[in-house]
Amino acid sequence: LTEVESLFYPWVKQTFYLVYQIVKEKIAASLEKAFSQYGFAEPSVPQLKNACEVSLRTLYKYYPSKEAMIVAALEHRHQRYLSFLLEDAPANGTPTVLHLFTRLEDWMKEFAPNGCMSINALAAYPENLSINQAVKQHKLAVRQLMVQLSQREDLATTLFLLHEGLSNAWPVLGHAAFASAEHTLLELMKENNQ
């Protein structure tokens, strides 16, 4: 490299990397939306390409298989979900846990009327290790968030099971699932604060 080239090379390299990351993130967001809307069995890779508004070559450059596309969608959704849950959350304790469940109901209404996308992915691809790992990491992170915000390690599994029960019952029961979970949650927190 010439002296001039060596001055610009780091800048050019960084710019290409940033563009790569932006495109990758845009594709992951589009994949999340497509899988949420159509499920995992229905969309073919060409349909996913159209949903992402990129060429097939570009799609495969970033995500070389349908399973890799699913993992990207799940990881993108995971980040979005945690941010959504934490938006305007009180500091900690019972009010925070109630807030998380209220946000979960809002999420189910707006983004997941057909149930938990992670569980749906696992049902569609039960033998895929990458998808299994992405779902497991997501679920463990949600459980850890419950512990962190409730400050109740002793209730971690119970709170997590309430969360999972609500998200899985939502497509059938709707708001009734939330109302029941909220009632159980209030009783649980009251009972364990005595």
Predicted regions and their residues:
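Helix-turn-helix
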Residues: 26, 30-68, 72
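Short, basic, alpha-helical segments at the C-terminal edge of helix-turn-helix-like DNA-binding modules
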Residues: 75-81
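Short alpha-helical scaffolding segments that buttress acidic/His motifs in well-ordered protein cores
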Residues: 104, 118, 122, 159, ...
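Amphipathic alpha-helical segments used for helix-helix packing
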Residues: 108-130
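N-terminal intrinsically disordered/low-complexity leader segments
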Residues: 1-22, 194
